[in-house]
Amino acid sequence: METTLPLPFLVGVSVPPGLNDIKEGLSREEVSCLGCVFFEVKPQTLEKILRFLKRHNVEFEPYFDVTALESIDDIITLLDAGARKVFVKTEQLADLSAYGSRVAPIVTGSSAALLSSATESGLLLSGFDQTASEAAQFLEEARDKKITPFFIKPVPGADLEQFIQVAAKANAIPILPSTGLTTKKDEAGKLAISTILSSVWKSDRPDGLLPTVVVDEHDTALGLVYSSAESVNEALRTQTGVYQSRKRGLWYKGATSGDTQELVRISLDCDNDALKFVVKQKGRFCHLDQSGCFGQLKGLPKLEQTLISRKQSAPEGSYTARLFSDEKLVRAKIMEEAEELCTAQTPQEIAFEAADLFYFALTRAVAAGVTLADIERSLDAKSWKVKRRTGDAKGKWAEKEGIKPAASALAATSAPVTKEAAQETTPEKITMRRFDASKVSTEELDAALKRPAQKSSDAIYKIIVPIIEDVRKNGDKAVLSYTHKFEKATSLTSPVLKAPFPKELMQLPEETIAAIDVSFENIRKFHAAQKEEKPLQVETMPGVVCSRFSRPIEAVGCYIPGGTAVLPSTALMLGVPAMVAGCNKIVFASPPRADGTITPEIVYVAHKVGAESIVLAGGAQAVAAMAYGTESITKVDKILGPGNQFVTAAKMFVSNDTNAAVGIDMPAGPSEVLVIADKDANPAFVASDLLSQAEHGVDSQVILIAIDLDEEHLQAIEDEVHRQATELPRVQIVRGSIAHSITVQVKTVEEAMELSNKYAPEHLILQIKEAEKAVDLVMNAGSVFIGAWTPESVGDYSAGVNHSLPTYGFAKQYSGVNLASFVKHITSSNLTAEGLKNVGQAVMQLAKVEELEAHRRAVSIRLEHMSKSN
């Protein structure tokens, strides 16, 4: 099994080493030498783990099960603190897709069907029982699927030696509990680390020894030795350099010479045929008068060694002694050399001045007791951060170079910032990039307005299609299994809640009931007004009457995202129009909470709109259940409602499957808003409208089109955005969204509306003078919010308009959900004999042109019959 991990397994530790006394299994020091550790994070342990990472995120390579964390911000904070990889619930993947391979799904069980949840970032299968009946099928399918990387965690009490063999057959990386491991000889009930390593390494020597490269903390090779299972065990037990002499048995490095080693890390190479020991070397490694068997140290390690030696023994009054004792001198020299480096011109000059700067900087570090390894660890730690400043120059250094604070924003690249880039460029101040439409090309502006790239459809389909097929074939059983797995609602025995709904499931505070009732009535009024008073009827020519009449779609499915979230607004926006339209069967679908219940707000709305049932599932499985129907879930004719990328992809998939015979409302993408503001706009209002959409997700985009605003007004809006954003609980999500959001400066309302129509926003907010007049210029938008007193929030909840709207530019082709979304229009034709005579010749001629003789004859036979009758 090939892996990029230092060792082909992770060590599972219940609490980070050092935060408690480890009384069983591996010690903190032993775990540190192995490096790769696995933790399960819970809300109550999060702060402890963050403190641990602050001190040890380079010493250890931590992997986390974060399924107990509901907050996306908390998970992002873990990534920023140095988590190498987090394993999340599948429904959290879309919100964390910006973090690429550092986020992977986790599923629980021993079924081969769970393997379909794998993504390009891999998969963690937790709670695997190698004794289960389905384990054999699992092994076979796991080998065929070739998931990379594939992690597997056993059930408690599993036989670890057998489990490792099973993992190897599945090409999986096992997660082994520290409590079941040991470095002691023949400790009953424990598996020796040396046994694990020797079972995977490959030696071509008759004696089975493995070549071992010994390096210092800078990865400088010190020498080549050999290791055995016994020597590795002893090295881990003592945390020292212990190797296998080909002649004299165990070799404790430095036992006689005093040139000892402190063991830092053990790892295998990519082919598992060589070991690497990272050590802190005291004295020399080589028996000759040189630091290592391959020669003396060079470069920065050599300089550090020299400085440490001089610090201990520099003659009093020497220049080196002055540097170590005179902080002002060192500071002045660092400033001097930094300036000389900045003014150097040729490559030779730059190398020369950089070397001088490094010398004085390292002198400053050594004087403070900071090693080169400490500096390298700090660099490595920074490489794992996902929240970063832009790196703009500040204070007197910026002033000296003539750099103004806003210059970096004005000079920002016009290329769109992807979600991947958002994790790399998180500014200290939350601010949108600015573009002056009069100073950039059309191409540059189009690129800046480009929406964030979404996860590839292939990657999403790889996840959802097996789920859809499973539900289609196995019905209720499949839906229940996914609800148990994804929502942890293991107590559920039925995947659906049928009406009438028990009163105890909709117990709510009076103020919540009142708010829902007000919103219900406003939404009902607005959608009822959309009803056609009577069928359309037109006599196109004498005797030819054409009509169009509407009929409700008989069965509709309303998808309501949720689980722990409470989303009565979406239930209202879908359920009320369906009720007004007269749909015979209204089916809600929403993921239940862990106890198997639906939030009472949604049950109450379902009761008010007369819903037939509530499907207790979310994601692709809920969409599939409504599209195909199951033993207990009603098949619907149309599915409506928002969701993440997986829900949207599932809706698209079933709508293209003729076996499902189901329609959907519209394609969907991340939420977005475009605000047009002029000098009359209140900066606080503008900022609040921008942030109301930015908090939806890191892939949301918000656009401000500023009409003839001066620097003071623009700065006031930017200040409000930052101030309000930092007060929000979802501030890190806002940072990700703002990273690909922009302000465009224009001169006129007409110019602003032209840009808006080109962008076709989901939400368009007009905070301008005489906003009502500008509505005439709107050609493409999901919903428009007019004037200073109309925040987008009222449309989301209670005004009456629908909040299920086209995104990602689809407002050019689609309407938002409305009454027409729940009805279909049927046309009819009613001809008299005179009418057929009037239109018959035209019909027959066109049928003749298209060579459809039966069509022509259907008219000619009737006309001949008329002639004979006369």
Swiss-Prot record:
Chain residues that bind Zn(2+): Q693, H696, D796, H855
GO annotation, cellular component aspect: cytoplasm
Cofactor(s) in the UniProt record: Zn(2+)
Protein name (Swiss-Prot/TrEMBL): Histidine biosynthesis trifunctional protein
GO MF assignments: ATP binding; histidinol dehydrogenase activity; metal ion binding; NAD binding; phosphoribosyl-AMP cyclohydrolase activity; phosphoribosyl-ATP diphosphatase activity
UniProt pathway annotation: Amino-acid biosynthesis; L-histidine biosynthesis; L-histidine from 5-phospho-alpha-D-ribose 1-diphosphate: step 2/9; Amino-acid biosynthesis; L-histidine biosynthesis; L-histidine from 5-phospho-alpha-D-ribose 1-diphosphate: step 3/9; Amino-acid biosynthesis; L-histidine biosynthesis; L-histidine from 5-phospho-alpha-D-ribose 1-diphosphate: step 9/9
Annotated spans, Phosphoribosyl-ATP pyrophosphohydrolase: 286-367
PROSITE patterns from the UniProt entry: HISOL_DEHYDROGENASE
Keywords: Amino-acid biosynthesis, ATP-binding, Histidine biosynthesis, Hydrolase, Metal-binding, Multifunctional enzyme, NAD, Nucleotide-binding, Oxidoreductase, Zinc
Region spans: Phosphoribosyl-AMP cyclohydrolase: 1-285
InterPro entries in the record: Ald_DH/histidinol_DH, HisE, Histidine_synth_trifunct, Histidinol_DH_CS, Hstdl_DH, PRib-ATP_PPHydrolase-like, PRib_AMP_CycHydrolase_dom, PRib_AMP_CycHydrolase_sf
CDD domains per record: Histidinol_dh, NTP-PPase_His4
Residues covered by region (Histidinol dehydrogenase): 368-870
Short name of any one Pfam family annotated for the protein: PRA-CH
Annotated catalysed reactions: 1-(5-phospho-beta-D-ribosyl)-5'-AMP + H2O = 1-(5-phospho-beta-D-ribosyl)-5-[(5-phospho-beta-D-ribosylamino)methylideneamino]imidazole-4-carboxamide; 1-(5-phospho-beta-D-ribosyl)-ATP + H2O = 1-(5-phospho-beta-D-ribosyl)-5'-AMP + diphosphate + H(+); L-histidinol + 2 NAD(+) + H2O = L-histidine + 2 NADH + 3 H(+)
Hydrolase is among the record's keywords: yes
Cofactor binding comment, as recorded: Binds 1 zinc ion.
Active-site residues, as the UniProt record annotates them: E762, H763
Family according to the record: In the C-terminal section; belongs to the histidinol dehydrogenase family.
Effect upon mutating D708N: In strain: FGSC 541
GO biological process per UniProt: L-histidine biosynthetic process
EC number of this enzyme: 3.5.4.19, 3.6.1.31, 1.1.1.23
Gene this protein is translated from: his-3
Outcome of mutating L410P: In strain: FGSC 541
Superkingdom assignment: Eukaryota
Organism: Neurospora crassa (strain ATCC 24698 / 74-OR23-1A / CBS 708.71 / DSM 1257 / FGSC 987)
